[in-house]
Amino acid sequence: SFTTGITELGGTYYNQLWKDSNFVLGEPVSELRYVGRNVDIIMARLVKNETVELFGANTTVPFINGCDSTYHPCQILADALTLLEKFGSLNVKFLYIGAKNNVFNSLVEFFSKMEMGTLYGLTPLVNDTAVDADFYEKAKATGYYVELDPTMSMEEARKYVKDMDVLYTDTWVDMEFFNNPAYAQKKEETLKMMMPYQINKEFLEGSHAIVLHDMPMHVGYEISQDVVDENLEHILDQAENRRHAEKAVMATLLGKGQLL
């Protein structure tokens, strides 16, 4: 979406894999500053948030966090655009069910900072690299994030569903691990634990909420096929909006006219 977006804005992109770059050989900050001599803007998808923070503090050109293991800010900008398109407002009741991961963290940050709407989080599964207990406590103190008991059953959670405008889920197993044989046992354990938390038609009975998923979806696990079928246009709009939101970020950072 970023590469298509910068092309639509009239720019040119260069794709560099970390493993094939001088970042694995040299001193990272020096390499980053050299990259900045050759481009006008950098978007990086990195594993560690610490690396993102290091690069953001030392870059000589605008630097965008495309995704890391702790946060996924650009996804949430796309989600916000989707809410505006569907509801005309960010003042919605929003229930997230799934893993406490980078997408969830950015949702928490968004709702608590925008101070509009209410995010309810039911997160029985925890990705250790994403956890920041102090961050969650500060978000809860704003009143715009409500942390549900992670041991709550889906039957108990149904009492919240009837009042929600949006239900949101994400993959339970990160995409780099889903088909990794070395992770097979852990994957099976995770899926067995989380199957009771699938978003399906039975769970949604009596609900007016739309269902969103940031993709890729593992249909039959976190979300059932019939729920996907009924909400596919919403989910595809959400996915397309990544490109539009990212174009807005890049155009803003570069300044009007620089891409024309």
Where are these regions (language model features)?
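Glycine-rich phosphate/diphosphate-binding loop of Rossmann-like nucleotide-binding domains
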Residues: 1-5, 85-170, 175-177
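Phosphate/diphosphate ligand-binding glycine-rich loop within oxidoreductases
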Residues: 2-84, 219
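Short, structured coil segments at secondary-structure junctions
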Residues: 9, 38, 58-60, 115, ...
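Short, charged, surface-exposed secondary-structure boundary motifs
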Residues: 24-25, 72-78, 129-133, 244-248
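Short hydrophobic/aromatic-enriched beta-strand-loop microsegments
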Residues: 61-67, 118-120, 234-237
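Rossmann-like adenosine-cofactor binding region
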Residues: 141-226
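Adenosine-phosphate binding glycine-rich loop
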Residues: 208-260
